[in-house]
Design a protein with these regions (language model features):
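Nucleotide-activated chemistry modules centered on ATP-dependent adenylation/adenylyltransferase
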Residues: 1-232
Length: 232
């Protein structure tokens, strides 16, 4: 709520329509109805999202009466596959994530002062130190992770209590859902992101690596924010 009231129309939210992202969409819709402030929401469409993921986007838009921007990379999937001889996420996964996610993110954030993301600290070791309110130096923007200290159980309890729409692939064993060529269901006792980039040791797309610096770590303040805002 603080972020919405503080930044207003200068706040945006990124979502890949994971369970956590759906929770934030629902929360922002509730806050919109309470405050009259609508938050921009966008999705980075790599061209390889599951059909079920795209169907969920439409369902969320209808349920919460809120349109969600689609941001696409400059190179189409067909052009990338013709150039590489197959899906780029299989041929050059790191470059693919950079070209189809990291670069488009810069366009999506243009004109905004802060953005919200649905990452949790307990998802991967790389995310354990994520502050609730930090700074993304690559895009010179405040980065807010409202669910940073939530657990998977917290997320699904909220979903059940508020009847939040989610991806039907979760019912088929997909814990974390990314691009269809490199995402598989997870097995019992596997890490929830074990199904991403299946067959490799890749764990992150790059959107959240080195992009969460505590406000306290900056040499200059960001819109008056202080070190206190990073404490949880």
């Amino acid at each position: 709520r603080w972020a919405l009231e503080y930044y207003g129309e200068k706040l945006t939210m990124a979502t890949a329509f994971g369970a956590e992202g759906c929770v934030l969409v629902a929360m922002l819709a509730e806050l919109r109805d309470e405050t009259g402030i609508a938050t921009d929401i966008f999705n980075l469409d790599t061209g390889y999202q599951f059909p079920q993921t795209l169907a969920l986007k439409s369902k969320l838009e209808k349920r919460y009466n809120h349109s969600i921007r689609t941001i696409r990379p400059e190179e189409t999937p067909a052009a990338a596959e013709a150039r590489l001889g197959g899906p780029p996420c299989l041929k050059e996964p790191d470059v693919c994530c950079y070209n189809r996610k990291v670069v488009p993110l810069a366009r999506a954030l243009d004109g905004y002062e802060a953005y919200s993301t649905a990452v949790r600290r307990d998802q991967t070791p790389e995310r354990q130190g994520i502050p609730i309110i930090g700074f993304d130096p690559r895009h010179n923007i405040v980065k807010i992770a409202p669910l940073a200290n939530w657990t998977k159980e917290d997320v699904w309890n909220y979903i059940r209590e508020h009847d939040v729409p989610t991806n039907i692939l979760h019912e088929q064993g997909f814990a974390s859902i990314g691009c269809w060529p490199v995402t598989r269901p997870v097995q019992i006792n596997e890490d929830e992101r074990a199904g991403r980039w299946a067959g490799s040791d890749k764990r992150e797309c790059g959107l959240h690596l080195h992009s969460h610096l505590p406000i306290a770590g900056r040499s200059t303040p960001v819109d008056g924010l202080t070190a206190q805002t990073t404490k949880v």
